């Protein structure tokens, strides 16, 4: 008996637990984001509202507001999220619940240990997380984004301008 899939299989996309766009943002767009973020102050990143220990997370963050200055970034991200969601997960997406988090990992041991991008309160509504690689991987050592499902993990593609989209409930 020759079985056919109920849904057509798209051979030309990455059928994984995450979706990515190599060169999702151009070098010029990345430079615009980096330069535009300079007016906002960094603060030490915390883990939820409990503070932070450098053991779990060592980074600095700033929040880029939803305003006309960043509208083009949000529009581009949402277009990519829509494509990824329709291709892989088909989540019922209603709104954006967070401003854009701009994160800088310090050269001296900067990291963020295994974690979920969901938790109590407003972040319990998160469904999809997005990362945009703002630096050229040749400029630093380490810094791999890894996604774990079950007991296996995958190191996702990285390159300046690469956008990686994944369900917030994955490690």
List the model feature ranges, each with a label.
Residues 1-163, 169-171:
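Fe(II)/2-oxoglutarate oxygenase catalytic core
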